[in-house]
C-alpha cells in the first residue's frame, strides 16, 4: 500500500510493528485510505490500562483471534490505533504513548493535541 504516506513531521511514514503485524492493510505501517473508516493512523505503545479501556469499550485487543491471524496484544506491543479511540483514552488520561515517526499525518485530522504534546515513547524506543 505504501504510496509514500507521511508521518506527523511530514516525513516518510516509518514502520509501527511487524511483530505483531499491524496497520489497516497489515503492512506494519499505520497507512490509511478512504476504505479505512476507523482511521487506524496512530502508532501507540500498548499499556495494560489502555488495553483494558479498549476492552471495556467493546474492542478486545487482548484475546487472540487465530482465524484472523491475530495473536492478541500485550503491554509493550506497538499497534496502529483508530485516532478516535486514542483521543477517547487521552480525554480519560489513559492514552498510550505514541510513536510519532510511525503515526500517520492523517491522525492530525482528529487529534490536534498531538501537535502540542511531547512524545516520550519516541525517546525511549530510539
Summary of predicted features, one role per range:
Residues 2-74, 85-93, 99-112, 118:
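A charge-rich, low-complexity, intrinsically flexible signal that marks solvent-exposed coils, linkers
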Residues 116-126:
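Single conserved hydrophobic/aromatic residue that forms the stacking wall/gate
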Amino acid at each position: 500500500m505504501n504510496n509514500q504516506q507521511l508521518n506527523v513531521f511530514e516525513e516518510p511514514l516509518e514502520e509501527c510493528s511487524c511483530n505483531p503485524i499491524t496497520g489497516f492493510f497489515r503492512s506494519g505501517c499505520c497507512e490509511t485510505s478512504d476504505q479505512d473508516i476507523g482511521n487506524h493512523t496512530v502508532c501507540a505503545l500498548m499499556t495494560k490500562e489502555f488495553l483494558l479501556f479498549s476492552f471495556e469499550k467493546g474492542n478486545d485487543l487482548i484475546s487472540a483471534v487465530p482465524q484472523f491471524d491475530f495473536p492478541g496484544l500485550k503491554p509493550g506491543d506497538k499497534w496502529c490505533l483508530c485516532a478516535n479511540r486514542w483521543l477517547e483514552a487521552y480525554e480519560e488520561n489513559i492514552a498510550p504513548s505514541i510513536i510519532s515517526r510511525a503515526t500517520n499525518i492523517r491522525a492530525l485530522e482528529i487529534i490536534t493535541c498531538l501537535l502540542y504534546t511531547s512524545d516520550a515513547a519516541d525517546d525511549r524506543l530510539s
